[in-house]
């Protein structure tokens, strides 16, 4: 797709959907706050990766060259505490779980970032940023730490809407702070913890400083889009903006935030003990099915997890997969075509994936009708469009990444012929009002794991029954 229709995105800073206009025509720069690698990734972590991978794929489909940066926070209080409790070196602990996150992203075919900087690899840039803030009067030292002076930056709170009088950083009381609303840029060295030399003494970086330094290093002082979970709006992203602008730079021009994965209405988190780790989830469903599920809701919506919702997503994905395989068996090769205009309209409307998926399933229904009526050209046209649309969503069933059924194509063809014959017999029985025979045929198919749905266009069949 070379023509670029108007893309509109919800900007948290504006509190509204805005036309997206990149800094440089044809180029888009994106920074996504990545993982703090303290433990196994769960579906709440990975949802942001999937959501903004769809954004990236759509921008690429629109013809943009996309620079996509996703950082790794590999030094943090939680990492240090967990490593110490386990009797392991902190760097080994971080490296172990960084690999686990990489494996999770790869399993769900999240495109690798253009660069994936680690916090510990950019200490020099962080120190330079803090020095600039001190020189400009926006930061100060206290008891070996360095803090950002919130009152020195009058625009503080513009992203989150927090009034300065109501600010609580969640850092606890610190003796070196002039004001408890200030936040930490640098933590003074403590016995047994890693530390780096600076003009104000040894120590390690604060979380909020890390992302500013790495975003500047890879995307420059001003870039297009900053992404992350909605829980990062305050204080993390608010504090990033304050540092960058107080230092005399710009920062992100659009802020996109995804909703949480919830269970029982509560955010999925390790502290609540309600997490579903990616390795465990991949024992329950295939990676493409999990990706489909995580990407199926609007990115700004909460995604309430339930087994029923997960299985509904699996059934929907399998329905698309089976249609594409039926077309390939009956008609031949199915190459990706073009997404239909309504799909494009949906994604251009703040990545409205539910509406986009509705177009996928409408195309599947039309394609099945065409296939059953012998209109192979019409079925192929819908199948090619579906491949394009599902590819943009990152879960095209016929893509080599997800293709697991080549070896069963011949068997699927045989099943299709046999099921069609049975359904024809069932239709004859229904015409003759022989309901007992019609039910017997349907039950026989169900016992074989084949679900039959009667529609206005005739019976449709899918695999997926449990044979019970």
Curated annotation (Swiss-Prot):
SMART domains: DALR_2
Swiss-Prot/TrEMBL keywords: Aminoacyl-tRNA synthetase, ATP-binding, Cytoplasm, Ligase, Metal-binding, Nucleotide-binding, Protein biosynthesis, Zinc
Keyword Nucleotide-binding: yes
Cofactor note: Binds 1 zinc ion per subunit.
Motif ('KMSKS' region): 267-271
Annotated positions binding Zn(2+): 33, 211, 236, 240
Matching Gene3D superfamilies: Cysteine-tRNA ligase, C-terminal anti-codon recognition domain, HUPs
Residues given in the record as ATP binding sites: 270
Biological processes, Gene Ontology terms: cysteinyl-tRNA aminoacylation
Compartments reported by the entry: Cytoplasm
Gene Ontology molecular-function annotations: ATP binding; cysteine-tRNA ligase activity; zinc ion binding
Highest taxon of the lineage: Bacteria
UniProt catalytic activity: tRNA(Cys) + L-cysteine + ATP = L-cysteinyl-tRNA(Cys) + AMP + diphosphate
Transmembrane regions: none
Motif stretch ('HIGH' region): 35-45
Cofactor: Zn(2+)
EC class name: ligase
An example Gene Ontology CC term for this record: cytosol
Enzyme Commission number, as recorded: 6.1.1.16
Family: Belongs to the class-I aminoacyl-tRNA synthetase family.
Assembly description: Monomer.
NCBIfam families cross-referenced by the UniProt entry: cysS
Protein's UniProt name: Cysteine--tRNA ligase
